[in-house]
Amino acid sequence: MSAVIVNTVEQCGYFNRGQCQSCRHIQVPMAQQLMAKSLELQQLLKPFVAPSAAIFYPPVTGEATAFRNKAKMVVLGAAHAPVLGIVSPSGEAVSLCDCLLYPSDMQKLLHRLTQFVQQAGIPPYRVDKAKGELKFILLTRSQVRGEYLLRFVLRSHNSIERIERALPTLLAEYPQINVVSVNIQPIHMAILEGDEEIFLTENTRLEERFNDVPLFIRPKSFFQTNPQVAAQLYQTAREWVAEFAPKSLWDLFCGVGGFGLHCATKDIALTGIEIEAEAISCAQISANLMGLEKVQFMALDSTDFAQGKNAADKPDLIIVNPPRRGIGEALCQSLSEFAPRAILYSSCNPKTLAKDLEHIQGYHLTKVQLFDLFPHTDHFEVLAMLVKD
């Protein structure tokens, strides 16, 4: 079983046996991975860069292992022999508790959670039979204190009492588990979470800190999975934005406020927009702790918000940090019409970044930097500064 695997970045047992292919480039040296990603980025953005322009900054990377702060474990097997991990390409249940992307303390806790499921007698959900209860275990780690947010995704309320009975022993053994919740996902589909969240602890949010900015994680709020590189991403955004000395700032798709809060000062009027209400509540708590009074966070669709404004409302600078689909043609048009002095675009999908750049009129790229938040994969984050012509 995976519990006795000794993994190194050169020799991942899961990858070598074909059990997990998530880190498809794990046997490629990090320098080569970065070179390939950099070349891909430069090729994608080539149509938007003048031939003599030196706008690409050196890529930023972090550790090759033990960097990930979130585990999404499918619960497989049976109540007496649960497995936390994935279904391999060959169809077998594979425990990923020893995945080398996780810090060692997180690996140990994942093993303990496997025991917890067994001791509590919670039957894993069987997709093939549409029976069972426990679908996923989601574990998020805060690097600032080593604390955890633990979520059990269940088909129904039937096993909540079993979790509650076994929980005191677990929390006594692991007091660093700060938040525990149950999410109810009754649909027989590959959906990670449902609408209903039930907290089993008094605490409902996990505290994190990047640079000097306090940030908070709630069960449904998006948060970067590579804290070391994410901190550098936010710090770079802060430095780039400060060069414009803006008096007003919009942070669209703001999540828990990471970008806007890093760039804000007591003199900047910041408006943060995010569709997820939980994330907005976290962002507001952070702003209050930082003593920022000229800040407004609202749970709205970013495109709808922008389309409801007119040119007189425009800020000096707009930050966008969209999901993989990008910001879309409608928001591109709104940004072009507002014509702020600059637009800072943080993208987790350079293909949609390039597509959006085709529709943002009247701007040119001045800085582009790659942040390797997802080593061993094809994915990476890009920070791009667009300045008005």
From Swiss-Prot:
GO annotation terms (biological process): rRNA base methylation
One Gene Ontology MF term: 4 iron, 4 sulfur cluster binding
Keywords for this protein: 4Fe-4S, Iron, Iron-sulfur, Metal-binding, Methyltransferase, rRNA processing, S-adenosyl-L-methionine, Transferase
Binding sites annotated in the UniProt record for [4Fe-4S] cluster: C12, C20, C23, C99
Positions bound to S-adenosyl-L-methionine: Q224, F253, E274, N321
Gene3D superfamilies for the chain: 2.40.50.1070, Vaccinia Virus protein VP39
SUPFAM superfamilies reported in the protein's UniProt record: S-adenosyl-L-methionine-dependent methyltransferases (SSF53335)
Catalysed transformations (reactions): uridine(747) in 23S rRNA + S-adenosyl-L-methionine = 5-methyluridine(747) in 23S rRNA + S-adenosyl-L-homocysteine + H(+)
Signal sequence interval, chain numbering: none
Active site (UniProt): C348 (nucleophile)
E.C. no: 2.1.1.189
Enzyme class: transferase
Domain of life per record: Bacteria
InterPro entries: 23SrRNA_MeTrfase_RlmC, MeTrfase_TrmA_AS, MeTrfase_TrmA_CS, SAM-dependent_MTases_sf, U5_MeTrfase_fam
HAMAP family: 23SrRNA_methyltr_RlmC (MF_01012)
Role this protein plays: Catalyzes the formation of 5-methyl-uridine at position 747 (m5U747) in 23S rRNA.
Family according to the record: Belongs to the class I-like SAM-binding methyltransferase superfamily. RNA M5U methyltransferase family. RlmC subfamily.
Name of the featured protein: 23S rRNA (uracil(747)-C(5))-methyltransferase RlmC
Provenance organism: Shewanella sp. (strain W3-18-1)
Classification of source organism: Bacteria, Pseudomonadati, Pseudomonadota, Gammaproteobacteria, Alteromonadales
